[in-house]
């Protein structure tokens, strides 16, 4: 359906809420999201959305993939078990920092964010160690070594700018 002036669009219905819950449950089941042991527990957008939607358990079988944790960077860690592939890190690194260190690799369940053509993050020649990627991560996938997300003051002022840039490029 093409967008028209005066069009009425429903963004909140029982059917849409059901779909939102299902998508969120699939995100939880796809990777190893165990909130009680996560560095982002209590400060995670995925967890907050699940609470808002009233999700108390997942109706899909968990996959429990063996995803790697890259702690090779001197300041930061990426835990692929917690990544939801939102690509905020990719976009902030490219559009705000201008480094384009992050990218996506693989398809489907094998997809993951990578640095410099799948080099360990600590060996990246393009990473400026600015930490912008860590600050925009909605889960505990990117975090500072030795700190929980609760200890970090997340600076997310980049998010409205990313939306604006995307709209200008379209």
Task: Show which residues each predicted segment covers.
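Fe-S ferredoxin-like electron-transfer domains
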Residues: 1-126, 135, 140-170
């Amino acid at each position: 359906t093409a967008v028209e002036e005066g069009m009425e669009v429903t963004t909140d219905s029982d059917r849409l809420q059901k779909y939102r819950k299902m998508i969120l449950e699939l995100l939880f089941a796809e990777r190893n999201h165990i909130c009680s042991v996560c560095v982002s527990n209590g400060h995670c957008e995925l967890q907050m959305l699940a609470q808002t939607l009233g999700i108390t358990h997942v109706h899909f079988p968990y996959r429990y993939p063996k995803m790697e944790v890259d702690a090779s960077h001197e300041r930061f860690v990426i835990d692929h078990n917690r990544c939801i592939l939102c690509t905020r890190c990719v976009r902030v690194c490219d559009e705000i920092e201008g480094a384009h260190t992050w990218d996506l690799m693989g398809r489907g369940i094998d997809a993951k964010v990578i640095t410099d053509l799948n080099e360990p993050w600590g060996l990246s020649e393009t990473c400026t160690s600015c930490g912008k990627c860590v600050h925009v991560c909605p889960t505990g996938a990117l975090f500072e070594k030795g700190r929980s997300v609760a200890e970090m003051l997340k600076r997310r002022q980049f998010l409205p700018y990313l939306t604006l840039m995307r709209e200008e490029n379209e």
